[in-house]
């Protein structure tokens, strides 16, 4: 009965924000439909292609699942960071990995754990997302700047998770330079290949390691990611926990945290360089 009460309470907490997300998707579809009609009336070539709605049954299931993942996540601010199993994707040949500890021993394609990339002396910024999530890919240039500016005092890890909007699932219109056409991952090779595709489009500094979540989505579940999320691990604890994406995904908060804790050390490093 206690478990049922908890589940009911969580459901009641989720419902208001779930319906607000449904309203947002309905408004988004209305705007896109209006734009499509205007272009059609003007006989523009831009109307070619399929118009995809966001408010679909599959879309609603994905949104609901994302709130459940957030509600039942293992990660808590100030508590131990979940040591999820991941697969190493990126190589750091030619990169400067000084101070990264055991990270240098992890071979590309090897199965490892998230905290293998953490160092006792330095915070680890962990960025979760996928190529088919526009809010995530649109912030990759800002994430790259964070790596470039703070790699002297912090380590960075990008965790590639399940696709947010696979082309054979809850797809979104591919009308921007940030859009990707990636199908649902059928195996670990598919997920790692998608991560490599992302790296080919958005080059990240060698100081940032890239891994892929396992096919059981253990990192996604433990950190309640769903679409995207960012956190900071320090001494095996969660020092900063970002909000649930896409609306609460905020790299600016990460910048503020790093500046607050390490701005003086960064300045000394730049002067020494």
From Swiss-Prot:
Post-translational modification, as annotated: Ubiquitinated by MARCHF6, leading to its degradation by the proteasome. Deubiquitinated by USP20 and USP33.
Reactions mediated catalytically: 3,3',5-triiodo-L-thyronine + iodide + A + H(+) = L-thyroxine + AH2; 3,3'-diiodo-L-thyronine + iodide + A + H(+) = 3,3',5'-triiodo-L-thyronine + AH2; 3'-iodo-L-thyronine + iodide + A + H(+) = 3',5'-diiodo-L-thyronine + AH2; 3,3'-diiodothyronamine + iodide + A + H(+) = 3,3',5'-triiodothyronamine + AH2
Any GO CC annotation of this UniProt entry: plasma membrane
Membrane-traversing stretches: 10-34
Predominant localisation class: endoplasmic reticulum
Record GO terms (molecular function): selenium binding; thyroxine 5'-deiodinase activity; thyroxine 5-deiodinase activity; ubiquitin protein ligase binding
Keyword Transmembrane helix found: yes
Membrane is among the record's keywords: yes
Cellular compartment(s): Endoplasmic reticulum membrane
EC assignment: 1.21.99.4
The organism's place on the tree of life at top rank: Eukaryota
Subunit details: Predominantly monomer. Can form homodimers but homodimerization is not essential for enzyme activity. Interacts with USP20 and USP33. Interacts with MARCHF6.
Its job: Plays a crucial role in the metabolism of thyroid hormones (TH) and has specific roles in TH activation and inactivation by deiodination. Catalyzes the deiodination of L-thyroxine (T4) to 3,5,3'-triiodothyronine (T3), 3,3',5'-triiodothyronine (rT3) to 3,3'-diiodothyronine (3,3'-T2) and 3',5'-diiodothyronine (3',5'-T2) to 3'-monoiodothyronine (3'-T1) via outer-ring deiodination (ORD). Catalyzes the phenolic ring deiodinations of 3,3',5'-triiodothyronamine and 3',5'- diiodothyronamine.
Xref: PANTHER family: IODOTHYRONINE DEIODINASE, TYPE II IODOTHYRONINE DEIODINASE
Protein name: Type II iodothyronine deiodinase
Organism: Homo sapiens (Human)
